[in-house]
Amino acid sequence: MKMNPDKFHLLLSNRKELKINICNETISSSKHEKLLGVTIDSKLSFEEHINNLCKKASQKVNALARLASLMSFDQRKLILNSFITTHFSYCPLVWMFHSRHLNNKINAIHERALRIIYQDYKSSFQELLNKDNSPTVHQRNLQKLVTELFKIKIGEAPEIMNEIFQIEERPYNLRNEVFVKRHNVRTVRYGTEAVSFLAPKIWDLVPEDCKNETDLIAFKEKIKNWIPDSCPCRICKKYVQNLGFL
């Protein structure tokens, strides 16, 4: 099969722009590329991807606002769950540990949608979440993360997940057994903020009655009611200006 250099793309985690020659064609490195529906940038910040998600979700919130007066409450709720929050449910494990700035953008869209649904323009975001009996997008993504870890635990995860989250074999059993291997890291963005590093810590926060489940469906039902507390990621940590994360 003859190669088509026009379809070649080069993405490097490097500040400098590089060029390579293939079949006398020059391929320049790009700042971001879309792969399987996820826009990956050279800094692995996923800012481009999340901004695109926010733009699409915001457009649908605007459409909902225009038509809200013509819809019933159930119809407005259906629009939220089917066409707005679903934008943030595709491949969340890849991009979920993004910046606080991006998390605020997502929450702002979610908050505005809830205000339109409940016609409530006085309550706080947390009060709206309580009224809706729903978590934030980030909290829902944390639920999905621990669900994937549970699949690994019971042997129902795809092989690639077993490569990312390696099982730690122990000669004895502990009540709070850590079955996902913890890695030593040296950096923040590609180390302590990586999903492979944070996953075991987040698993520790899961209630014991959920961990002790043996059935995936039963685990999913229980984990829906779990609101993560004291999550160790940068999004959830308290930040004090001129001091840093606490």
Spans of features found by a protein language model:
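Short, charged alpha-helical motifs in flexible N/C-terminal segments and linkers
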Residues: M1-H9, L93, L102-Q166
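Conserved, non-catalytic sequence blocks in retroelement Pol enzymes and Pol-derived host proteins
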Residues: K2, L44-L53, A68-L78, M96-I106, ...
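Short, conserved micro-motifs composed of acidic
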Residues: K2-H32
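Amphipathic alpha-helical
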Residues: I22, E159-L198
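Basic, alpha-helical interaction scaffolds
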Residues: I27-V94
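Short, conserved catalytic/metal-binding micro-motifs enriched in Asp/Glu and His
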Residues: L35-K43, A57, I84, F88-M96, ...
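Hydrophobic alpha-helix feature that most strongly marks membrane-spanning transmembrane helices
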Residues: I40, N62, R66-S69, I84, ...
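C-terminal helix/juxtamembrane-tail motif
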Residues: K220-L246
